[in-house]
Amino acid sequence: MIRTIAFATFAAFPVTLPYAQEVAPYLDDRSTAERVVASLYNAVNRQEYLRAHSYFAPRTAPDLSAFREGYATTQSVRLRHGEVIAEGAAGTLRFAVPVAIEAVTTEGSAVYTGCYRLSQVQPASQELPPFRPIGIGSGQLSESDTPFDTAMGTCDLQ
């Protein structure tokens, strides 16, 4: 099953504002792996890079300055994800989310495919603060020649 999540679009405003970006509705949902990835790109579309960065697990998060700079020319992003792979063992839940991303930048647009790997300590096993929600441990994306509507990354849990 493939779900499509479309984010920022552009609208024209007459007279005083020649153009402006329509702001995507706010989404911060850490209840499932695919919703964490959707929330990441929602934050990117809204240019809320600190929030986008917060979806990464603290020990594996990229440097915030470099992360923010990586999106300097990004105008909007569309996300599709494939079937999530999940497993639970020894008190930890692990997930792999295949994705296709269309990024529109000041230089044009490009399609990327890849995989995000996420994990969470079983919520019932967490007894000391702070609570640790599902977090992105890693993500690998590669530019693709496949059109966004048919592109999709591949994943495993390794």
Where are these regions (language model features)?
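Positively charged n-region of N-terminal signal peptides that target proteins for export
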Residues: M1-T4
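Bacterial N-terminal signal peptides
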Residues: A6-P14
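Sec/Tat signal peptide C-region and signal peptidase I cleavage site
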Residues: T16-A20
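Short solvent-exposed beta->alpha transition segments
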Residues: V23-A24, D28, E34-S39, Y49-R94
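Exposed beta-sheet edge and beta->alpha loop/turn motif
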Residues: A90-Q158
